[in-house]
Amino acid sequence: VRTVCLALPTNRECADTVTAVGAEAAHAARRFGVRVHLLVLDSADPAARARHAAAAAALPPVEGVVVHHLDEDAQRAFLRGAIERSGLPGPDRLLDLMLPDAVSYGACTNRAFLLAAALGCTSVHRRDSDSRYQWHDGAPVFPIEHELATIGLKAADAAAAVTEHTLDPAHADKPVALVGASFIGELSVDLGEIRELDPETYHDVVALWAPTGATEEERRELVAESFTGAGTEPFTADRAVLDRPDIWRIDMCNIALDHEVYERVPLPPATDTIGSDYFLHHLVHDATLPGVTHNRHIVNYYTPERRTGSGFTAYQERYAKFLLSMLYLHPVYADMERAGGALLDEHHHVRPEAIADSARRSAATDRAENHRRLAELDRCYRRLGGKYAEFADHLAPARARLLDEAQADIEDFALLIDAWGPLVRASRATPADRLPR
């Protein structure tokens, strides 16, 4: 029986999402005959955790579905064991990269990857706490329908399960490494208010994540494509395309990854940085691995804490760090694009050493572009006034720290890639009595 992991990392109250994802797990087990480990990785406050535990306990028992609700203590205990078994140097440093004190979108997904390895899963299917399913003909529109139909299959064999097949026949023997769709509803990054207040400033703020040297036309295209997902058009009928994955149309709240990818290269463990969990999108695409892009989009909505007070400040700082991370990630993306299929070995497996080397090289990139990004962000936010000008006041004394953190983040990524193979093997070797309950 194929074993898969349906993962829901959360740091906020989302009991309704736990219930909804539980229904998707039950659907997967019944429809595909798979064993589903439903993994709720919970970093929320104690009151929210208690509600999540109650929601998980209230899920109707379904044959083939195993529910794990793990707080940070349980996650830490698992990680300590895996790190210890790996024999890697610097165990405390590795634990910090895997479970930092701060928010890390990459690290929470990396924990799901290692737990999935421990539980014998062949794929990870990730959902998010601030999303819900569309409904059509009285039933929820579950993305796992497309994910389990194709993930991990040889592309030639997956062709029968999609509505369109445009993959170059040269890639027919490679496995489907990624299956995903996007979201409908609000922007995936909480900048919608800026877009409404001042579209010109919105353009300037979003264009800051363009690569160094991008033309004005390239920047305009980037702004038009960024953070909008699949717009607002609701689901009416299935469409699934087998090709290189359309990474602009796949969101981390709606994705399945094959273990042959995530067991070789982790996500960047950057803290307080939005978008740090999209690296494997680029890797799969650039390495010429097949993917399926479908249209079972999830509904994205916002929790109000991002828009006022300390929640607003924290979120805008994560956006600033996202912009700074691009100084180091764009050169890695460029290296991967140039390498193409050379990123794979003869078994169509990704070569992690090439990625680690590229990340290490990019850490030495001149910071001038990031100084410019921060100055431009300051100008834009002061132009908006109000709480945005107040955020600019908050950002000014933090500049040196943020610049240092962005460089340290890419260095940490290289270090984690080096450690990843031993960590995955150590996770697979977790004794039965130490597996997550």
Feature annotation, model-predicted:
Residues 48-119:
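Active-site-proximal specificity loops/subdomain of glycosyltransferases
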Residues 127-128, 291-299:
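Catalytic beta-strand/loop signature of glycosyltransferases that borders the donor
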Residues 97, 121-138:
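Short beta-strand-to-loop acidic/aromatic patch adjacent to the donor-nucleotide binding site
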Residues 3-5, 37, 279:
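Cell-envelope/extracellular polymer assembly enzymes that use nucleotide-activated donors
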Residues 255, 261, 272-289:
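A short, conserved alpha-helix in the catalytic core of glycosyltransferases
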Residues 133-258, 263:
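Conserved catalytic core of nucleotide-sugar-dependent glycosyltransferases
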Residues 20-35, 55-62:
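Short, acidic, metal-binding catalytic loop of nucleotide-sugar glycosyltransferases
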Residues 7-13, 20, 38-50, 55-56, ...:
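Terminal low-complexity segments of carbohydrate-biosynthetic enzymes
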